[in-house]
Amino acid sequence: MKSSVNIQDHFLNQLRKENIPVTVFLLNGFQLRGLVKGFDNFTVILETEGKQQLVYKHAISTFAPQRNVQMKTENEPS
């Protein structure tokens, strides 16, 4: 049985593993910039200038990475 891929988790995990700088747009229009250090079902930890922020996912509109994120999985053919 093939397990379904969670795109959100894969995307955030690649941002974290590859230390890709990201701009996070919040629903209120505020922007946060930094590195994703961790995440779970409800929150994202963003590090900016050595300081961490816990951001609730329900407040996030968009993640805009500074470069493209590799979305191909290990088991996916080229």
From Swiss-Prot:
One of its GO terms (molecular function) is RNA binding. RNA chaperone that binds small regulatory RNA (sRNAs) and mRNAs to facilitate mRNA translational regulation in response to envelope stress, environmental stress and changes in metabolite concentrations. Also binds with high specificity to tRNAs. It comes from Halalkalibacterium halodurans (strain ATCC BAA-125 / DSM 18197 / FERM 7344 / JCM 9153 / C-125) (Bacillus halodurans). NCBIfam families: Hfq (TIGR02383), PRK00395.1 (NF001602). The gene is hfq. Residues 9-69 form the Sm domain. SUPFAM superfamilies: Sm-like ribonucleoproteins (SSF50182). Keywords: RNA-binding, Stress response. GO terms for cellular component: cytosol. Belongs to the Hfq family. This is RNA-binding protein Hfq. HAMAP family: Hfq. Homohexamer. GO terms for biological process: regulation of DNA-templated transcription; regulation of RNA stability; regulation of translation, ncRNA-mediated.
